[in-house]
Amino acid sequence: MYQPPDAGHWTGRIDSVKDERAFRLHQRIRLLDLSQPLETAAERAAAFIGFACDEGVRRNQGRQGAKEAPAAVKAALARLPWHLPEGVVVYDAGDVVCIDERLEQSQTELGKAVARLLKNGMASIVIGGGHETAYGHYLGVREALGTDARLGILNIDAHFDLRPYDDGPTSGTMFRQILDQDDQVSYFCLGIQRLGNTAALFADAETYRCRYMLEDELTAGPIEAAYEQIEKFAADHDAVMLTFCMDAISAAAAPGVSAPSPFGLAPSLARALIRRIVSHPKTISVDLCEVNPLLDEGGKTVALAAAFCMEALLHFQRLQPRR
């Protein structure tokens, strides 16, 4: 079910009502109701769309609570300072909410919302929700691109999420679903934990010809090796979407997730990967998933997720001034 944006999420400290250099995001955000006809987007525009759903996590035997994340992350974003270039417009496009365990219907609805934003010329940032968010996100990107475009999916994650879906989709099946139904998609996962995936899942990754880099490869560096692989991957595709699972981050920095990672990525390393990926001209859309405010400690996971979303905004190549 679609819910229009809630202005109540966008409040916070006010340092000035006149000096725009002192503004925060809550003073610049615009509300966009997708149930109404869309205005023509600014030349450089982006929109947040929430996916309040953790039904996929429940089906995957995980710990629920991620459906609370869109509201919490938006409230944390509201307080961050505005550093975007002049002329950029940022919208809150509301939320798609999963009702009565209707995961598949909700993913379809999210896809329609994302497609509408992209077709209107906006960059989209989807705030999940469990990682089942990524499937709905993909549906929207594919609709916007058309059936023939080669799409690269970059996933920053501790897990492959290539589980079988004989008993229905979950938060651990979506990339297998996508690869089974779309031969114009390739998949590259950064941050894989050897102790977070069975030998069967590593075998499945080989079967599906997935590219991946282990967490310890990324941590040992140099990061330029990852950058080189990202560039090669993007070069093979017409467009790229980024999906980011917060359980890729070390549990010390991101305890508020369903499946915390004791040997996860450092936030600064993840930030560098986000910056590199979204600054590529082929990257058109981003999602961030698996924040669970009910399991968080002092709001640190929510705050980190909001910072990652802002980093995506700041470095989206399509939001930079035209030269």
UniProtKB/Swiss-Prot annotation:
Enzyme Commission number(s) from the entry: 3.5.3.8
Cofactor binding, note field: Binds 2 manganese ions per subunit.
Pathway entry: Amino-acid degradation; L-histidine degradation into L-glutamate; L-glutamate from N-formimidoyl-L-glutamate (hydrolase route): step 1/1
Residues binding Mn(2+) 1: 131, 157, 161, 245
Keywords (A to Z) from UniProt: Histidine metabolism, Hydrolase, Manganese, Metal-binding
Enzyme class: hydrolase
InterPro entries assigned to the protein according to its UniProt record, in alphabetical order: HutG, Ureohydrolase, Ureohydrolase_dom_sf
Cofactors demanded by this protein: Mn(2+)
Residues reported to bind Mn(2+) 2: 157, 159, 245, 247
Superkingdom of origin: Bacteria
GO molecular function: agmatinase activity; formimidoylglutamase activity; manganese ion binding
GO terms under biological process: L-histidine catabolic process to glutamate and formamide; L-histidine catabolic process to glutamate and formate; putrescine biosynthetic process from arginine, via agmatine
The reaction(s) this protein catalyses: N-formimidoyl-L-glutamate + H2O = formamide + L-glutamate
CDD domains, A to Z: Formimidoylglutamase (cd09988)
Stored Gene3D superfamilies: Ureohydrolase domain
Presence of keyword Disulfide bond: no
Function text: Catalyzes the conversion of N-formimidoyl-L-glutamate to L-glutamate and formamide.
PANTHER family on file: ARGINASE/AGMATINASE, FORMIMIDOYLGLUTAMASE
Matching HAMAP family: Formimidoylglutam (MF_00737)
Family to which the UniProt record says this protein belongs: Belongs to the arginase family.
NCBIfam families: hutG
Protein known as: Formimidoylglutamase
Protein species of origin: Geobacillus kaustophilus (strain HTA426)
Native organism taxonomy: Bacteria, Bacillati, Bacillota, Bacilli, Bacillales
